[in-house]
Structures are given as structure tokens and as C-alpha cells.
A protein has these predicted regions:
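N-terminal "arm"/small-domain region of PLP-dependent enzymes with the aminotransferase-like
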Residues: 1-33
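Conserved PLP-enzyme active-site core in the AAT-like
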Residues: 5-8, 12, 16, 44, ...
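Conserved N-terminal alpha-helix of the aminotransferase class I/II PLP-enzyme fold
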Residues: 25-72, 95-101
Length: 184
């Protein structure tokens, strides 16, 4: 018998512990994702998702793990042979690189020690050197270390180029402001 003092805690980036009200909601009957009750829920939460992500743009929920969302972004935003810049400072920055290579993209990497934030000036320098880069792939927060990267500053830099900024916000959204429209 475990007491409240000896409750096991999940100290991982995922899965995470659930609040009691979430556990209660998960105990309800399932609804079909192609029926009206589900559509009504999606219609109701869409405006809230926009506020959460700091955007006026439509937000598209995906029914997959975070890696699936990263794969969806790369496969839908770029074509085989496109050049992308990956700035990595941990496991999930490396995941961007792996996904991009697997999709047939030409990857230019900037690697930093785990636990360090990506210096925006390095992104600026590389984009000046390589104006043919179609996209910059970064984390808002590197899940493996907890470091928040300066997405706002990097967004200002990418707006001055033709490169599309693609941000993995999986471990940042909900715990740190992520004003996507302002960041670009």
C-alpha cells in the first residue's frame, strides 16, 4: 500500500502525471472522431488553441506524438532536396536533423553543447552565408535539457530572409509564453 508520502512521481518529459480532473475525464465513454460531438468539441476549443499559441492563424491539432508532428511539418513544408538549417543543442534538435535527412532534405547543422541556448547571431550569419536555405528548424525548449531558445530573436532574423522558421514547441507551449504571430 502506497501512502501519499510515497507516491511514485514521473519526472520525465513525457508521459507526465495527470491532474485528478483529467483522469476523471479520461474515464468517460469514448466519442467517435468523425461524429458531431467531436466536431462540436473541436469547434469550441479552436479559439482557445489560438490564444494558447499566440496566433490569429488556424491551429491544426494532430493525433500523433510530438515526433509525428515534427515529421508532418517537414513533409508538408519542404520538398526533397530543399536546404534547411538545423540548430541543435540536445536530443530533440538532433531529431529535427534525423527527420529532415530522412525526408531527403539537405541539412546544414549548427551544433551546440547540451544545456546551452542557440545564439541567434549564428543563425543570422549562416542565413547570410547560405541564402538558399529554405527553412530553419529549432526547438522553443529543448526537452532533453529544459533550455529555452531565443525563438523571438531567431524569428526576427528569419523574417529578414526567405527561410521559413519551424519551431517544435512541444515542451514549451503551456509552460512558457509562445507568441507565434509576434515571433514570426
Amino acid at each position: 500500500n502506497r501512502s501519499m508520502l510515497h507516491k511514485e512521481r514521473l519526472l520525465t518529459p513525457g508521459p507526465t502525471e495527470l491532474a485528478p480532473q483529467v483522469k476523471a475525464a479520461l474515464g468517460r465513454d469514448m466519442i467517435h472522431h468523425r461524429k458531431d460531438p467531436f466536431r462540436q468539441i473541436m469547434h469550441r476549443i479552436q479559439p482557445e488553441l489560438g490564444r494558447l499559441f499566440g496566433t490569429e492563424q488556424p491551429v491544426m491539432p494532430l493525433a500523433c506524438a510530438g515526433t509525428g508532428a515534427m515529421q508532418a511539418a517537414v513533409s508538408n513544408l519542404f520538398r526533397s532536396g530543399d536546404k534547411v538549417l538545423v540548430a541543435k543543442a540536445g536530443k530533440f534538435g538532433q531529431r529535427w536533423e534525423d527527420i529532415a535527412r530522412n525526408q531527403g532534405l539537405e541539412v546544414d547543422s549548427l551544433a551546440y553543447p547540451w544545456g546551452e541556448a542557440i545564439p541567434p547571431e549564428d543563425i543570422a550569419d549562416r542565413l547570410k552565408e547560405r541564402p538558399d536555405i529554405a527553412g530553419v528548424l529549432i526547438q522553443a525548449s529543448e526537452t532533453s535539457t529544459g533550455v529555452l531558445h531565443p525563438v523571438g530573436a531567431i524569428g526576427r532574423i528569419t523574417r529578414e530572409s526567405d527561410a521559413l522558421l519551424v519551431v517544435d514547441g512541444i515542451s514549451a507551449v503551456g509552460i512558457s509564453p509562445c507568441p507565434m504571430d509576434r515571433w514570426g
